[in-house]
């Protein structure tokens, strides 16, 4: 039950960042931090920065982390910042993933880059 509650709270916080409820999302992130849910905390913080348009700070913060599941978020930052070679390097790393969702993301980003 506790894990399910943590997941639901993280989802609420992410929805909050998308609707510019950054303070509220940060409160949830702080609570999740106390519960040891660091990857969720970092995702909420990255999402908050990105939804404020601060892609440079999100990328800087994200590059310090060791959470492979956050790599697509960092690729989005590189895309928005026009960092083509960094983005291509990240997409090449992501393309080696066995996760079909990551493969779909990489293919979608590469299609987006063509336009």
Curated annotation (Swiss-Prot):
Pfam families: Type_III_YscG (PF09477)
Subcellular location: Cytoplasm
Transmembrane segments: none
Superkingdom field: Bacteria
Cytoplasm found in the keyword field: yes
Alphabetically ordered keywords of this record: Cytoplasm, Plasmid
Disruption phenotype: Deletion mutant has no detectable level of YopN secretion, YscF expression or YscEFG assembly, but it expresses normal levels of another Ysc component, YscJ/SctJ. Deletion mutant fails to secrete YopE at 37 degrees Celsius in the presence or absence of calcium.
Keyword Lipid biosynthesis: no
Predominant subcellular localization, coarse grouping: cytoplasm
CC terms in the record's Gene Ontology section: cytoplasm
UniProt similarity note: Belongs to the YscG family.
Function: Chaperone of the type III secretion system (T3SS), also called injectisome, which is used to inject bacterial effector proteins into eukaryotic host cells. Along with YscE, prevents premature polymerization of the YscF/SctF needle protein within the cytoplasm. Is also required for stable expression of cytosolic YscF and for YscF secretion. May act as a scaffold to organize the assembly of YscE and YscF into the heterotrimeric complex. Required for Yop secretion.
Subunit structure: Component of the heterodimeric YscE-YscG chaperone. The YscE-YscG chaperone forms a stable ternary complex with YscF/SctF. YscG interacts with YscE and binds tightly to the C-terminal half of YscF.
Name by which UniProt lists this protein: Type 3 secretion system chaperone YscG
Organism for this UniProt entry: Yersinia pestis
Lineage: Bacteria, Pseudomonadati, Pseudomonadota, Gammaproteobacteria, Enterobacterales
